[in-house]
Amino acid sequence: NNCPLDWLPMNGLCYKIFNQLKTWEDAEMFCRKYKPGCHLASFHLYGESLEIAEYISDYHKGQDNVWIGLWDKKKDFSWEWTDRSCIDYLNWNKNQPDHYKNKEFCVELVSLSGYRLWNDQVCESKDAFLCQCKF
């Protein structure tokens, strides 16, 4: 694998948790500026969720939820990944997504679920975040 030392290699891509708190959009922009082709992380298999959850539990400083690259751009429960990969796997927390008060359109990993399950959240909330890159 060609991933830098503190990145997690998985299925040909590299993943890294960033502990600074950013809004969803600022986090996606940070990932994109880090290196061309980088985005907030996308998930396609249950096994990836478990491996990422373990990695975040090991390396994340703090109890913050963690942004991933899923969002509801059209605000109608039609979810999209920022890397434009296909939506072939979802792992929502119980009773989610709910677009609570019609304000939640960005997706985070829930720290209380051990970073395994997903919640839709207000995009202006500040979370830690997970970038995905190809090196």
Curated annotation (Swiss-Prot):
Can you supply one Gene Ontology CC term for this chain's record?
A: extracellular region
| Sequence motif: Galactose-binding, positions | 96-98
Q: What is this protein called?
A: C-type Lectin CRL
Location(s) in or outside the cell: Secreted
Q: Which residues bind Ca(2+)?
A: 96, 98, 104, 119-120
Q: Which InterPro entries match?
A: C-type_lectin-like, C-type_lectin-like/link_sf, C-type_lectin/snaclec_domain, C-type_lectin_CS, CTDL_fold
Q: Where is the C-type lectin domain?
A: 10-132
What coarse category fits the chief subcellular location reported for this protein? secreted
> Which cysteine residues pair off into disulfide bonds?
3-14, 31-131, 38-133, 106-123
Domain of life, per lineage: Eukaryota
Question: CDD domains, per this entry?
Answer: CLECT_REG-1_like
Q: What else is known?
A: Negative results: does not induce platelet aggregation and does not inhibit platelet aggregation mediated by von Willebrand factor or fibrinogen with agonists.
Task: Please give the Gene Ontology molecular function terms for this protein.
Answer: carbohydrate binding; metal ion binding
Record keywords: Signal included? no
Per the record, the similarity remark reads: Belongs to the true venom lectin family.
Q: In which tissues is it expressed?
A: Expressed by the venom gland.
